């Protein structure tokens, strides 16, 4: 099953990147490697049921069961014990990744209130892009009546690009709505 974004990458994005950056071989063109979605649930230390609903939300949004993230060490001030479940994350690759990216860029982000584009300053220097979302309600699969609490999430686009400029161009060609200066 070939996806719209994957076809767009092969037919439009790669030739455009090769022109702009002067690559000799199509394998030199940067590509999307994976998308990691993380949901930190701090309240989970007091109420484990909260984590269940976060896992549920993430499963509905991504179509893949999340892995629980656990505390690396105990911190007394936060009443946190080592190995306590405090969040969940999903790593999407291949078709799931393209499906999610397509849904995020074309459906979810335009539904954000007062949306004027995502920041282009969130690159890490190695060609990866991070994005924070304040509420899970922007995804059409989440029903407003069925959520117990509004939760945010971190989304990281991992690319094979060597520089931020290459990664930004890759995401821009995919249709990421960067804010206009």
Swiss-Prot record:
GO cellular component terms, semicolon-separated? ribonucleoprotein complex; ribosome
Species name? Clostridium kluyveri (strain ATCC 8527 / DSM 555 / NBRC 12016 / NCIMB 10680 / K1)
Could you list this entry's UniProt keywords, alphabetically sorted.
Ribonucleoprotein, Ribosomal protein, RNA-binding, rRNA-binding, tRNA-binding
One GO BP annotation here? translation
State one molecular function term (GO): tRNA binding
Protein family membership = Belongs to the universal ribosomal protein uL5 family.
Checking Gene3D superfamilies in the record gives: 3.30.1440.10
Q: Can you tell which superkingdom this protein's organism belongs to?
A: Bacteria
Keyword hit for Lipid metabolism: no
* Protein function: This is one of the proteins that bind and probably mediate the attachment of the 5S RNA into the large ribosomal subunit, where it forms part of the central protuberance. In the 70S ribosome it contacts protein S13 of the 30S subunit (bridge B1b), connecting the 2 subunits; this bridge is implicated in subunit movement. Contacts the P site tRNA; the 5S rRNA and some of its associated proteins might help stabilize positioning of ribosome-bound tRNAs.
- Subunit and partners: Part of the 50S ribosomal subunit; part of the 5S rRNA/L5/L18/L25 subcomplex. Contacts the 5S rRNA and the P site tRNA. Forms a bridge to the 30S subunit in the 70S ribosome.
PROSITE patterns linked to this entry: RIBOSOMAL_L5
Pfam families associated with the record: Ribosomal_L5, Ribosomal_L5_C
What is the official name of this protein in its record?
Large ribosomal subunit protein uL5
Check the record and name the HAMAP family matching this protein: Ribosomal_uL5_B
